[in-house]
Curated annotation (Swiss-Prot):
The modification N6-acetyllysine is found at K53, K430. Keywords: Acetylation, ATP-binding, Cytoplasm, Methylation, Nucleotide-binding, Phosphoprotein, Stress response. GO terms for cellular component: cytosol; extracellular exosome; lipid droplet; mitochondrion; nucleus. It comes from Rattus norvegicus. This is Heat shock 70 kDa protein 4. CDD domains: ASKHA_NBD_HSP70_HSPA4. Induction: Up-regulated in neuronal cells upon ischemia. The modification Phosphothreonine is found at T538.
Length: 840
């Protein structure tokens, strides 16, 4: 079973796998561990990763990058509107209202969803992992920003499904970094001791995230998270791009922003310049040849000037740092270390700001680029039964408060309740109790829209179906389980109606109105921490809730506490009936569309595979043409007649011309046939060359064998001690075989020497190898027969007592046996104790 962690970044992606030796970040086909988050569409196939990155300028309109932030967002979303101006490709509104990506693929215009494009990237990363692991990859853990909302997380989950992956967990990027940091630490405080608080700062290409985590031995708990969703490396790039657009506009009279390709080239150069300035404080040049209208442009920039231009960006570094301390109620002195990851944290001014805020040196023990993917791979290993990993519990948080709203018959309007406050532990489940006579709907939403980097606070609507009143017409008790799962996605996971069965009829006063007023009842399911914080109810409500919960579990015993003492109570039994729930999720792909996209992805993968095979076949023909043309005038020259060489050279030239004309776009089989046709002419020449190279070596080996056996025959005839044990008949056989081999070799050598190099050889290397094997099989067993061993005469023992017991020792065997028994008894007891020691 494969264990894979995927860091799905805005600009680049990383894949890590768990192996017996630990976690390893794997390289792609370009021997690069970083795969660009880029997909390019062509007339025949798609290019993904590094191959697509190389087409950003040449195929700008059909090369998609920076699509990560379109997940779960409508076309009318303000963020999408703001991004339009930065994109070289077109985005469109899909029939569902979501953002689509418009490209030309297979010679026709196509609109792809963000999920589909992300699935293409995931398929590539999956293929990379499979090529390294040599087995199928299905289970994985994928990283997402900690600020992703429910809709965005569901969208990424759909993308993993389209790519044929089983995502075991969507892991927050800062939590993955914390796991990669903590799981290897041997000096963490014990569970009963004060935890070690560590801040993790991740500034990538598009966003800035901060979290503070508490570590104990074998335990990680996220205390708080904060973020700036638009502050990242690309913002610093934009500062440089805008500066040089203005400078070159004045200096060279160029309107750079009107030309997409020019702007993309400038963006690439500015990114390189930014990285150089991180290591260099001096003036650095920026030069681009034939930039626009065949004009070469150049400019300079230094770190000091760059930082002045970035003052407003650098001012945004501190607020999230201050926010996590406020949320977690920690002081700067309580922070043990500050770990930084992400490409943009390499900017000296960013590091300086963070270090100055906390008043301590920053820690860089983690790989800034690969920490997230390593954490994801570790999480996948923890979740996978195939790996035994040190126990390490991870408690994440809910980034935004989540509330439920429902229609309240008692209040003749709507009621709401905050189910999961901000920074509530996750994953987590709670049970709410409602009293209803008919189906009802729960509306989930984020209750703090001002903190939400998303325009719509709605999450979903959940309709609880088939709710019926009790047999006496009173409201039924409905228990609804709500959950934030391991992916950070909220759901109403189940609903159950509690049926009351009475053993005898009796009229009892029903407190319908009171029950209606106490519709919302909540209890924590399974997990104990945060119970008091997570139930903001009055003591009276808590008491009513506990009594009500006990009623559902203990039956009639507690019912007496709720009813007036004068009313005689019937014997009551309860049972639960699961209720169906209909979900209406915000911007969620329906199952039918998901199935269609999965099928389309499979077809596109097959098309890419066929196109690759076609190109490989074409390249094989071209490669063969160049190889043979060079060798015909080189090492193969002596092995082909002049006429044949001229004819073959002409054929090769015709094939080369055909490749660039009529043969430029042919089916795979045409190239296969063309290569076979060329090889019928070229292979005999190649064979003659190879035979000529190998034949002398094999004849030399055969000659050495013959010489060796002749030497043995001579020694045998001279009756040397080494061979006197050999049988004369056998040696005659050896002599005969050796003489025959010598005659065969001399005959073939003479014939071959008379043969022209341009003709096929008289004797082939396979025949010589067979003759060597034949001679060895006959002669070697005979001459290597060992001499018979001569055993020395046995000597009489001088002392009989050394060979056994003597007179008077008749009882010794018993004694020895007893001693032996005593000796063996001790290990026996030890053996019995061994398992206990192992268990301890």
């Amino acid at each position: 079973m494969s264990v894979v962690g995927i860091d799905l970044g805005f600009q680049s992606c990383y894949v890590a796998v768990a192996r017996a030796g630990g976690i390893e970040t794997i390289a792609n086909e370009y021997s690069d561990r970083c795969t660009p988050a880029c997909v390019s569409f062509g007339p025949k196939n798609r290019s993904v990763g590094a191959a697509a990155k190389s087409q950003v300028i040449s195929n700008a309109k059909n090369t998609v990058q920076g699509f990560k932030r379109f997940h779960g967002r409508a076309f009318s979303d303000p963020f999408v509107e703001a991004e339009k101006s930065n994109l070289a490709y077109d985005i469109v509104q899909l029939p569902t209202g979501l953002t689509g990506i418009k490209v030309t693929y297979m010679e026709e215009e196509r609109n792809f969803t963000t999920e589909q494009v992300t699935a293409m990237l995931l398929s590539k990363l999956k293929e990379t992992a499979e090529s390294v692991l040599k087995k199928p990859v299905v289970d994985c853990v994928v990283s997402v920003p900690s600020f992703y909302t429910d809709a965005e997380r569901r969208s990424v989950m759909d993308a993993t499904q389209i790519a044929g992956l089983n995502c075991l967990r969507l892991m927050n990027e800062t939590t993955a970094v914390a796991l990669a940091y903590g799981i290897y630490k041997q000096d963490l405080p014990a569970l009963e001791e004060k935890p070690r608080n560590v801040v993790f700062v991740d500034m990538g290409h598009s966003a800035y995230q901060v979290s503070v985590c508490a570590f104990n031995r074998g335990k990680l708990k996220v205390l708080a998270t904060a973020f700036d969703t638009t502050l990242g490396g690309r913002k610093f790039d934009e500062v440089l791009v805008n500066h040089f657009c203005e400078e070159f506009g004045k200096k060279y009279k160029l309107d750079i922003k009107s030309k997409v390709r020019a702007l993309l080239r400038l963006s690439q150069e500015c990114e390189k310049l930014k990285k150089l300035m991180s290591a260099n404080a001096s003036d650095l040049p920026l030069s681009i040849e034939c930039f626009m209208n065949d004009i070469d442009v150049s400019g300079t920039m230094n770190r000091g000037k760059f930082l002045e231009m970035c003052d407003d960006l650098l001012a945004r570094v501190e607020p999230p740092l201050r926010s996590i301390l406020d949320q977690s109620k920690l002081k700067k002195e309580d922070i043990y270390a500050v770990e930084i990851v992400g490409g943009a944290t390499r900017i000296p001014a960013v590091k300086e700001k963070i270090s100055k805020f906390f008043g301590k040196e920053l820690s860089t023990t983690l790989n800034a680029d690969e920490a997230v993917t390593r954490g994801c791979a570790l999480q996948c290993a923890i979740l996978s039964p195939a790996f035994k990993v040190r126990e390490f519990s991870i408690t994440d948080v809910v980034p935004y408060p989540i509330s439920l709203r429902w229609n309240s018959p008692a209040e003749e309007g709507s009621s709401d309740c905050e189910v999961f406050p901000k920074n509530h532990a996750a994953p987590f489940s709670k049970v709410l109790t409602f009293y209803r006579k008919e189906p009802f709907t729960l509306e989930a939403y984020y209750s703090s829209p001002q903190d939400l980097p998303y325009p719509d606070p709605a999450i979903a609507q959940f309709s609880v179906q088939k709710v019926t009143p009790q047999s006496d017409g009173s409201s039924s008790k409905v228990k609804v389980k709500v959950r934030v799962n391991v992916h950070g996605i909220f759901s109403v996971s189940s609903a159950a109606l509690v049926e009351v069965h009475k053993s005898e009829e009796s009229e009892e006063p029903m407190e319908t109105d009171q029950n209606a007023k106490e519709e919302e009842k909540m209890q924590v399911d399974q997990e104990e921490p945060h119970t008091e914080e997570q139930q903001p109810q009055t003591p009276a409500e808590n008491k009513a809730e506990s009594e009500e919960m006990e009623t559902s579990q203990a039956g009639s015993k507690d019912k007496k506490m709720d009813q007036p003492p004068q009313a005689k109570k019937a014997k009551v039994k309860t049972s639960t009936v699961d209720l169906p729930i209909e979900s209406q999720l915000l911007w969620q792909l329906d199952r039918e569309m998901l199935g269609l996209y999965t099928e389309n992805e499979g077809k596109m993968i097959m098309q890419d595979k066929l196109e690759k095979e076609r190109n490989d076949a074409k390249n094989a023909v071209e490669e063969y043409v160049y190889e043979m043309r060079d060798k015909l005038s080189g090492e193969y020259e002596k092995f082909v007649s002049e006429d044949d060489r001229n004819n073959f050279t002409l054929k090769l030239e015709d094939t080369e011309n055909w490749l660039y004309e009529d043969g430029e776009d042919q089916p795979k089989q045409v190239y296969v046939d063309k290569l076979a046709e060329l090889r019928t002419l070229g292979q005999p020449i190649k064979t003659r060359f190879q035979e000529s190279e190998e034949r002398p070596k094999l004849f030399e080996e055969l000659g050495k064998q013959i010489q060796q056996y002749m030497k043995v025959i001579s020694s045998f005839k001279n009756k040397e001690d080494q061979y006197e044990h050999l049988d004369a008949a056998d040696m005659t056989k050896v002599e005969k075989s050796t003489n025959e081999a010598m005659e065969w070799m001399n005959s073939k050598l003479n014939l071959q020497n008379k043969q022209s190099l341009t003709a096929d050889p008289v004797v082939k290397t396979k025949e010589i190898e067979a003759k060597i094997k034949e001679l060895t099989n006959i002669c070697s067993p005979i001459i290597s027969k060992p001499k018979p061993k001569v055993e020395p005469p046995k000597e009489e023992p001088k002392h009989a007592e050394q060979n056994g017991p003597v007179d008077g020792q008749g009882d010794n065997p018993g004694t020895q046996a007893a001693e032996h028994g005593a000796d063996t008894a001790v290990p026996s007891d030890g053996d019995k104790k061994l398992p206990e020691m192992d268990i301890d």
